[in-house]
Amino acid sequence: MKVDLTGLRREFTQSGLNRTDLDNSPFGQFNLWFEQAQKADIIEPSAMSLATSDNNEIGIRTVLLKYFDMYGFVFFTNYNSKKSKELQSNPNVALLFPWLVLERQVKISGYVEKISMLESLKYFSSRPKASQLGSWASQQSSSLSSRKVLLSQFELMKVKFSNGKVPLPDFWGGYRVVPLKIEFWQGRENRLHDRFIYQLNKGKWRIERLAP
């Protein structure tokens, strides 16, 4: 079966991106674009694709950015999951934010490092109790015979932690993606898109325009 999609074509109509528009810091530029994405009609602007590799196998999935600062971009997961095992084997990763409503995307390349337990605890404590229980109930990436098994485990956790606070699992926490390259892409007419990349060189960020 062949499905022909060559007729699916639309022109990009948003305004362009010039060198003079850019913040000197990629984090400042990301913050500006992220704020604009939040105001746009985007369902989940913090959703990002996380690409990993391990033993010549490429993995990709969507995770949620929980916060960022001048040190990197933080997400949370189960440390026993398939993605975490890949990260332990090869910490080099890439992120992609596809803000298609704005005809934009941001690509980030770098490496991951675990955040501290205290930092993970601070975020875990802010989550709804049901989400905290879900972290305990799910053995992420393991095989399930049915959804009923997962729901039964969730009910067990509700009983186990019915009194008091839900503790942070020792197998759950955050990773920080430390960026080495951050590219900002803005769609333009005739596919002559604007691309600017920030590259870290001897502790300083260098900005360069790339051909589309």
Curated annotation (Swiss-Prot):
Gene3D superfamilies linked: Electron Transport, Fmn-binding Protein, Chain A
Name of the protein: Pyridoxine/pyridoxamine 5'-phosphate oxidase
Organism: Vesicomyosocius okutanii subsp. Calyptogena okutanii (strain HA)
Binding residues for substrate: K66, Y123, R127, S131, R191, L192, H193
Similarity comment: Belongs to the pyridoxamine 5'-phosphate oxidase family.
InterPro entries: Pyridox_Oxase, Pyridox_Oxase_CS, Pyridox_Oxase_N, Pyridoxamine_oxidase_dimer_C, Split_barrel_FMN-bd
Catalytic activity: pyridoxamine 5'-phosphate + O2 + H2O = pyridoxal 5'-phosphate + H2O2 + NH4(+); pyridoxine 5'-phosphate + O2 = pyridoxal 5'-phosphate + H2O2
HAMAP family in the record: PdxH
